[in-house]
Design a protein with these regions (language model features):
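Alpha-helical transmembrane segments of multi-pass small-molecule/ion transporters
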Residues: 1-239
């Protein structure tokens, strides 16, 4: 619904180039699927990995349907057919989500001793996530340096994702609190697969808007870092 709201705003105010650019950036931050690495942070925070993994798979499948439906309305130049765009999104989602999942299942089935050794390495998943984050941060800085936009537009592309990030974390935690799953719900809605978001922006929307999902990486991981610090210091989260 938030992504649909952004589509309406683009229709209403998209005649101005800079305004449309910022709105496209916000739109992609809303419509990005849940990050595959969300389970790493959720486990650290004490959330439910099982329910979150199920949600992540469902959310990524839903993304393959809704993105081809909305993108032609956001960017007129995105004249790729529904089936073609679905296939392209499916290929990307499969690469970052389904293939690692299948490899994990096959490893547990045929290489149980090796899996046990990997599981015994303390915080391995966390450090791998940090390594991936470093690459994404570098990509974000590169996009910023090469973006030919005004200073005001650049600031909006950097700070509008902060509002989007806080809003999605807040909505997820508020809804999840009613079901005793505020941590899992907050991470599910707030932690986005910005790799897919950047790819979608560069492929189908205005490439300059890719600064927004890149900035979202920074904000969501500042939120994650604060949560991890708070959990480590006080033993539980306040929100």
């Amino acid at each position: 619904s938030l992504a649909l709201m952004m589509v309406v705003l683009i229709f209403e105010f998209g005649s101005d180039y800079s305004t449309k650019l910022v709105l496209e950036g916000a739109f992609i931050c809303f419509i990005c699927p849940t990050a595959a690495a969300v389970a790493v942070v959720t486990e650290k925070l004490g959330g439910s990995i099982g329910s979150l993994t199920t949600y992540t798979v469902i959310a990524n499948i839903f993304t393959m349907i809704i993105i081809p439906s909305l993108f032609p309305m956001v960017e007129k130049g995105a004249d790729v057919s529904f089936l073609m765009m679905s296939a392209m999104v499916f290929r990307n989602v499969t690469t970052v989500l389904v293939v690692p999942l299948l490899l994990a299942l096959l490893s547990r089935r045929f290489l149980p001793k090796w899996v046990d050794k990997v599981k015994n390495v303390k915080d391995l998943g966390f450090y791998m996530w940090c390594f991936n984050l470093t690459i994404l941060m570098g990509e974000t800085v590169r996009n910023m340096l090469h973006a030919e936009v005004s200073g005001v537009t650049m600031l909006l592309l950097l700070f509008v994702p902060l509002l989007v990030c806080l809003l999605q974390f807040a909505i997820g935690k508020t809804v999840g609190r009613h079901f005793g799953a505020s941590i899992s719900a907050g991470q599910a809605l707030g932690q986005k697969n910005t790799v897919v978001g950047i790819w979608l922006t560069l492929t189908f929307l205005n490439p300059l808007a890719a600064v927004a999902p890149g900035a979202y990486v920074v904000w969501q991981n500042l939120v994650n870092g604060w949560q991890l610090w708070y959990k480590e210091k006080y033993g539980k989260l306040k929100w």
